[in-house]
């Protein structure tokens, strides 16, 4: 379906955005941009029923996931020592699989008779993850990186 092709195009666009537009920005700005693209895509899917807006939403979702996931991958890889990076990579991949499986499983439980509820749940998850990143993860990551360099 074209929707998934638009997500794939969004992933490719996120590579160019990360390389050229966000290359000189902070990690925090990248996460905020990625989460903003995710929120915009979810809101577009929730409030519009046209085919073209669903393709634009898919593009925004691909951009948001691409930027956010790559930033989390950098965090998971840069924290461990050299010989522990394989474990960090495997942990990251397992967390992706658990997240996808949990999303498929809980989507059917939470949204049984109300299919539009999934948009609001996803929006809540995006907001909570951004707040957690801003308040906990970002500070913890940079504190650990300073300890690692000492």
Model-derived features: positions:
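A late C-terminal transmembrane helix in Major Facilitator Superfamily
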Residues: 79-115
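Loop-to-transmembrane helix entry
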Residues: 1-10
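Multi-pass alpha-helical transporter architecture, strongest
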Residues: 116-150
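C-terminal transmembrane helical hairpin of 12-TM major facilitator-type secondary transporters
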Residues: 26-72
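Helix-to-loop junctions at the C-terminal end of transmembrane segments
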Residues: 13-28
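Signature of the 12-TM Major Facilitator Superfamily
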Residues: 2, 32-33, 87-91
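Helix-to-coil boundary motifs at intracellular loop junctions of multi-pass secondary transporters
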Residues: 24, 75-80
């Amino acid at each position: 379906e074209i929707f998934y092709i638009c997500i794939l195009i969004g992933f490719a666009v996120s590579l160019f955005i990360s390389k050229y537009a966000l290359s000189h920005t902070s990690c925090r700005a990248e996460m905020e941009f990625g989460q903003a693209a995710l929120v915009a895509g979810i809101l577009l899917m929730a409030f519009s029923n046209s085919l073209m807006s669903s393709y634009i939403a898919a593009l925004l979702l691909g951009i948001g996931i691409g930027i956010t996931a790559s930033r989390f991958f950098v965090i998971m890889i840069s924290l461990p020592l050299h010989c522990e990076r394989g474990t960090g990579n495997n942990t990251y991949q397992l967390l992706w699989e658990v997240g996808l499986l949990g999303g498929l499983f809980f989507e059917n439980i939470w949204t049984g008779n109300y299919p539009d509820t999934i948009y609001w749940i996803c929006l809540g998850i995006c907001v909570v993850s951004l707040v957690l990143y801003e308040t906990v993860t970002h500070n913890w990551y940079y504190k650990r990186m300073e300890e690692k360099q000492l």
